[in-house]
């Protein structure tokens, strides 16, 4: 991928444009997809912390497993907390709620300092050496655990951000995970132009992501009326709809211990007073939000649909499938 990254702008522009025409996507999406894959290749093969990270989240569902047909713009990474100076099992030590909250805040602050003082400067140095131009990487004040890479772009699209966000957190679980190949759309169409059309990335298994999404929806089902729903949250309902219509559902259903681990992890490191994680289990799982938030999610989904490049199911169809999934989980 480095050879393509170093092409002159006109050649890259032609490659992305021709790929977009073949795939029925916008030029800007094809371009950004390439840079997402390039960045993953760098992070997992040439970055100093290549052995201390794992890939998770929505982008992994589309790029590593082909489970969703949604263009996901961000790269979610798990950072080994030992990089921050913790022992392997230290975060799991028994603590009071107050002390656990203090530990979680401390781990967050250490992550922010690491990203600001060590990780981002190293990434800038490495990428400037590879790309031979001044690389624009930065951390936004209101999101200190996200490193932003503003790639040199040839196309504009108001529907997507012209940057790649590396969302990096240490308080996340690595297992189960496996190495999976990812391929840019441009390499799928014009593989002969690439010396390296794909790259192997350590990726969290989708059955864990399935339970992560289920517990997100369970929490949202209990969101208080006076608490605003985050933007772009309809993506979790779409993603779960897709996974529920794939073999991943059976794999997840066969591993209820993994659901327990996901719930325990969230309750310890992402405590939420109203989430009712103790009820996130067969028999008491709840996945359907309030009527008020259904309306909010429908509107959110309408704004997100242009990021779906495959079938675009109505949100009512998605909710019906989620309700069916809720019933299935509660009879396990």
Give residue spans per PLM region.
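Betabetaalpha-Me/HNH-type nuclease active-site subdomain
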Residues: 62
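Glycine-rich beta-strand-to-loop/alpha-helix junction loops that act as flexible
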Residues: 55-59
């Amino acid at each position: 991928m480095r050879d393509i990254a170093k092409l002159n702008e006109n050649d890259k522009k032609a490659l992305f444009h021709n790929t977009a025409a073949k795939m029925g996507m916008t030029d800007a999406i094809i371009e950004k997809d390439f840079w997402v894959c390039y960045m993953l290749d760098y992070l997992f093969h040439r970055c100093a912390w290549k052995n201390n990270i794992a890939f998770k989240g929505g982008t992994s569902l589309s790029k590593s497993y082909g489970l969703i047909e949604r263009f996901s713009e961000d790269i979610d990474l798990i950072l080994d907390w030992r990089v921050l100076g913790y022992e392997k099992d230290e975060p799991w030590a028994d603590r009071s709620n107050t002390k656990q909250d203090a530990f979680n805040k401390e781990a967050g602050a250490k992550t922010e300092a690491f990203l600001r003082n060590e990780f981002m400067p190293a990434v800038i140095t490495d990428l400037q050496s590879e790309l031979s131009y001044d690389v624009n990487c930065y951390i936004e004040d209101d999101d200190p655990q996200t490193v932003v890479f503003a790639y040199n772009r040839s196309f504009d699209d108001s529907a997507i951000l012209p940057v790649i966000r590396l969302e990096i957190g240490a308080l996340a679980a690595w297992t189960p995970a496996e190495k999976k190949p990812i391929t840019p759309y441009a390499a799928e169409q014009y593989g002969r132009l690439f010396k390296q059309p794909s790259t192997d990335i350590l990726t969290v298994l989708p059955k864990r992501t399935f339970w992560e999404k289920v517990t997100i929806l369970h929490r949202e089902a209990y969101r208080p009326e006076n608490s605003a729903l985050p933007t772009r949250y309809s993506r979790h309902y779409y993603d779960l709809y897709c996974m529920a219509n794939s073999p991943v559902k059976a794999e997840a259903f066969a591993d209820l211990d993994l659901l327990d681990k996901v719930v325990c992890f969230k309750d310890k490191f992402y405590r939420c007073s109203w989430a009712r994680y103790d009820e996130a289990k067969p028999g008491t799982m709840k996945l359907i939000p309030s009527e008020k938030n259904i309306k909010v999610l429908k509107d959110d989904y309408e704004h997100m649909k242009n990021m779906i490049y495959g079938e675009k199911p109505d949100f009512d169809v998605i909710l019906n499938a989620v309700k069916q999934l809720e019933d299935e989980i509660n009879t396990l």
